[in-house]
Curated annotation (Swiss-Prot):
The keyword Protein biosynthesis belongs to this UniProt entry's keyword annotation: yes
Pfam families on file: RRF
UniProt family annotation: Belongs to the RRF family.
Disulfide-linked positions: none
Primary localisation category: cytoplasm
Protein known as: Ribosome-recycling factor
Organism domain of life: Bacteria
UniProt organism field: Vibrio vulnificus (strain YJ016)
Cellular component terms per the entry's GO annotation: cytosol
Localization terms from the record: Cytoplasm
UniProt xrefs under SUPFAM superfamilies: Ribosome recycling factor, RRF
Gene Ontology biological process terms from the UniProt entry: cytoplasmic translational termination
Signal peptide annotation: none
Length: 185
């Protein structure tokens, strides 16, 4: 029973860390990366379809993304979807290939992005602490039902705290790497 609680807490904490990594991958740095456009949807025959399903996105070089649209008639719609996104990008089409040059980030914008990234990381830490709280309350319920002893409860809480510390450390490492990437010129 205790192992189930610990396993569940660990899985949920890992999912929180992965969700943070995924969220931070969408924050624009000075470098071109295909995941930058992963949040963009295109109107494809009346349905909002992710860009990655209607086109191939590759990083042509450090500052340019190249998008090859599978259906030529969608080129205009893809271009418009990129322009309408809040990424501040200006796509240029050349036949079926759309090139998206990434303008260099200003110092002020970098600092704003660092603040945003820190906020996301704090949200991840809060999620991990909430998972710890849930696991500890599950343990308290078992203790109240006399299904586990106080020693087992204390030992399990210590182990859950170790899981929490490890997850928070991972979040801090991800944050530090992203901040470093953002502040590179």
């Amino acid at each position: 029973m205790i192992n189930d609680i610990k396993k569940d807490a660990q899985e949920r904490m890992e999912k929180s860390v992965e969700a943070l990594k995924n969220s931070l991958s969408k924050v624009r740095t000075g470098r071109a990366h295909p995941s930058l456009l992963s949040g963009i949807s295109v109107d494809y025959y009346g349905a909002a379809t992710p860009l990655t399903q209607v086109a191939n996105v590759i990083a042509e070089d450090a500052r340019t993304l190249a998008i090859t649209v599978f259906d030529k008639e969608l080129t205009q719609k893809v271009e418009k979807a990129i322009m309408m996104s809040d990424l501040g990008l200006n796509p240029m089409s050349a036949g079926t290939v759309i090139r998206v040059p990434l303008p260099p980030l200003t110092e002020e914008r970098r600092k704003d992005l660092v603040k945003i990234v820190r906020g996301e990381a704090e949200g991840g830490r809060v999620a991990v602490r909430n998972i710890r709280r849930d696991a500890n309350s599950d343990l308290k319920a078992l203790l109240k039902e006399k299904e586990i002893s106080e020693d087992e409860d204390r030992k399990a809480q210590d182990e859950i705290q170790k899981l929490t510390d490890a997850a928070v450390k991972k979040i801090d490492d991800v944050l530090a790497a992203k901040e470093k990437e953002l502040m590179e010129v």
